[in-house]
Amino acid sequence: MSKKAEEIQAKQSLEKENSNFSKTGYSNSRLNRHIMYTPEPKLHFDAMTIVGNLNKNNAHKLSEFMSIAPQIRLWDILQTKFKAKALQEKVYIEYDKVKADAWDRRNMRVEFNPNKLTHEEMLWLKQNIIDYMEDDGFTRLDLAFDFEDDLSDYYAMTDKSVKKTIFYGRNGKPETKYFGVRDSDRFIRIYNKKQERKDNADIEVMSEHLWRVEIELKRDMVDYWNDCFNDLHILKPDWSSLEKVKDQAMIYMLIHEESTWGKLERRTKNKYREMLKSISEIDLTDLMKLTLKENEKQLQKQIEFWQREFRFWE
């Protein structure tokens, strides 16, 4: 964990203690609790979709190239459309002029996970596929924060009213949490990445825990990738620190019975959201913001590599 990360957690904990003493009136036992440090998460883009237009000349050139390139598997080929997978199925490519004209949208789409591509494969994809497109841009970016910590012990919520879905594991603990719906401009997933890899017989994870907070951004929201989760909170609230038994009971119910939120009016919801934040020593989203700030320039270079001039980031 970086020194900056330790400082922000220590400062945050102190601020919460001072705030809680004046706002909620907690018991003396709260003052004696140890501050728990969480390792800084690893951050990367996990999925990208780039769309653009192929003019008639470039569509012909690209179709000819793809029909002979050994890195590409081409199918559904017609004069005005084709589908393909490239680089051992790691890249999906689709061109459909008729559908694009009918829906008034760009006619070519390229989908891939940059983490699964080598530098050489990225260069190949940029030079041989993406550079054929005009008026290109991102319509999907996924930000992934990987924590070597057990996030099932945390309580996640948003300040906004969005649909929240929770799936539980065999041990009765939360294993996956969704905020929003898949078709929305922002869809947040918090899930046990280690368990997912185990279920899929994927690469073995050596860490004791591996959880991922994934923020899927679509359409206009991709422009706000560096400022897209200010309303999200991942907390460890201590309901027993509250003085009033009524508040303890309500907070306990809201944490353990999510459906209770739907029975409250807006003002009451806001009251208890603020109370939950005030009785938590840590909000992991502060660590996420710090990590994002430290990596922002590097991530921006990756975006610029795909969008602009041909140059690798350092």
Curated annotation (Swiss-Prot):
Biased amino acid composition, Basic and acidic residues: 1-18
Q: Which organism is it from?
A: Staphylococcus aureus
Query: Which Pfam families does the record associate with it?
Result: Rep_trans, RepD-like_N
Output the InterPro entries linked to this UniProt entry: REP-like_C (IPR003491), RepD-like_N (IPR054456)
Point out the signal peptide segment.
none
Any Gene Ontology biological process: DNA replication
Q: What is its biological role?
A: This protein is probably a specific topoisomerase involved in initiating replication. This protein is specifically required and may be rate-limiting for replication of the plasmid in vivo.
Give the UniProt family note. Belongs to the plasmid replication initiation factor family.
Keywords, sorted A to Z: DNA replication, Plasmid
According to UniProt, the name of this protein is: Replication initiation protein
